[in-house]
Amino acid sequence: MTTKKTSPDLLLVIITLLLLTIGLIMVYSASAVWADYKFDDSFFFAKRQLLFAGIGVIAMFFIMNVDYWTWRTWSKLLMVICFFLLVLVLIPGVGMVRNGSRSWIGVGAFSIQPSEFMKLAMIAFLAKFLSEKQKNITSFRRGFVPALGIVFSAFLIIMCQPDLGTGTVMVGTCIVMIFVAGARIAHFVFLGLIGLSGFVGLVLSAPYRIKRITSYLNPWEDPLGSGFQIIQSLYAVGPGGLFGMGLGQSRQKFFYLPEPQTDFIFAILSEELGFIGGTLILLLFSVLLWRGIRIALGAPDLYGSFVAVGIISMIAIQVMINIGVVTGLIPVTGITLPFLSYGGSSLTLMLMAVGVLLNVSRYSRY
């Protein structure tokens, strides 16, 4: 192992904290009306998000100082724990149901979403597998199939909740990691055909997914039903114009756009801060992606490279899906916007992941 740098990637730290700060401001702005109506406290969601942010930042700086090889050592145990929690959440009376998905476990006044932490555990485990078996990754039987086996076993359990959004991000992240490891294009084509068949099957197996597809193609066909959320999102994004209506001046958060502080927070941000504000957020994520790629390229070993690739891919895929949903480019999937959307498990997981990335940067050659 090369000598550790005196400090991690400072620009990555700054970008992360800047996104987090913007997120805290927007969570309050987006949720104040609903929080005041439901809890008689306009700061209800903002205070909880601030608590999650504090826990996440402490975890990020702690993990930043933990040798990333520790995750390699404990990756199997982490996977076992996450699999156990994923099964536990399916048990009636243990798992909590929200918006049709049994994805949470109650812990006092709060709840955790095990599938979020499975994403990071999967990255640590798959990076270990790929770094040890890279010479076999071009083999369909000895490399490609075993790598995907553990991924899809977790995906199937997550789909029992069901949580297509989180499962899609996890699988997409792992596919990028396997591709970077050197898997053959022909194997991905074969996987794509199987995946397309599976996707069609998943859509047809649940009426609400069919409604999501039809509302995506033509949301105005059912403006008060399946198309309501995306229409209200577009009503937020469009009027924002170039400079926005002003911070705190959103109209859609007045009970038009459901739960605007979660998956659709980018719509409120675009309405209040306009095209300029939305572009700034995309620019910040682009810089974060650039720093992550540099860290992956400069990592001293394959494990560090694969971990960095996995983390930055997870963030990038989640950003693309979330903004794609908000702008009507893809069907609604229920994915948070990293660092900005309200949600304790998602925010804590993302900050922990950045902590791992920062530790890899302390060994990076760039």
Curated annotation (Swiss-Prot):
**Primary location recorded for the protein, binned into one broad class:** membrane
Consequence when changing residue 263 to A: Severely reduced sporulation efficiency
A molecular-function term among this protein's GO annotations: lipid-linked peptidoglycan transporter activity
Q: Where in the cell is it found?
A: Cell membrane
Query: Do you know which InterPro entries this protein is assigned to?
Result: Cell_cycle_FtsW-rel_CS, FtsW, FtsW/RodA, SpoVE
In the record, the effect of residue 259 to A is given as: Moderately reduced sporulation efficiency
Indicate whether Transferase appears among the record's keywords. Answer: no
Changing residue 262 to S has the effect of: Moderately reduced sporulation efficiency
Name a single GO biological process.
Answer: peptidoglycan biosynthetic process
The membrane spanning regions, by residue number, are: 10-30, 50-70, 77-97, 105-125, 144-164, 185-205, 227-247, 264-284, 306-326, 337-357
GO cellular component terms listed in the entry, alphabetical order = cell division site; plasma membrane
Q: Which Pfam families match?
A: FTSW_RODA_SPOVE
Q: What does this protein do?
A: May play an essential role not only during sporulation, but also during vegetative growth.
Q: Which family does it belong to?
A: Belongs to the SEDS family. SpoVE subfamily.
Q: What is this protein called?
A: Stage V sporulation protein E
Q: What organism is recorded for this protein?
A: Bacillus subtilis (strain 168)
